[in-house]
Amino acid sequence: MLNIGFGNYISPQRLLAIVSPDSAPIKRLILEAREHHHLIDATHGRRTRAVLVLDGEIIVLSALHPETLVARLSPPP
């Protein structure tokens, strides 16, 4: 399981991409996911720093930086 912050976890097998929320296409993706009830906000009211795209059109918002999440995904040396 991948810790995405604040005691929230996702299955790494379902993860397709970890992206920054700053670009216009990602903002549109978040808006569409919210409209279709496919959005999970795991930021606990903090700023969104990473957008996780899961299979099944699920979008997850995280307050952790994408680099932090990738480091947690990578196996320890």
Swiss-Prot record:
Domain of life: Bacteria
A Pfam family per the record: RemA-like
PANTHER family cross-referenced by the UniProt entry: REGULATORY PROTEIN SSL2874-RELATED (PTHR38449:SF1), REGULATORY PROTEIN TM_1690-RELATED (PTHR38449)
Entry-linked HAMAP family: RemA
Similarity annotation: Belongs to the RemA family.
Protein name according to UniProt: Putative regulatory protein tsl2331
Native organism: Thermosynechococcus vestitus (strain NIES-2133 / IAM M-273 / BP-1)
Lineage: Bacteria, Bacillati, Cyanobacteriota, Cyanophyceae, Acaryochloridales
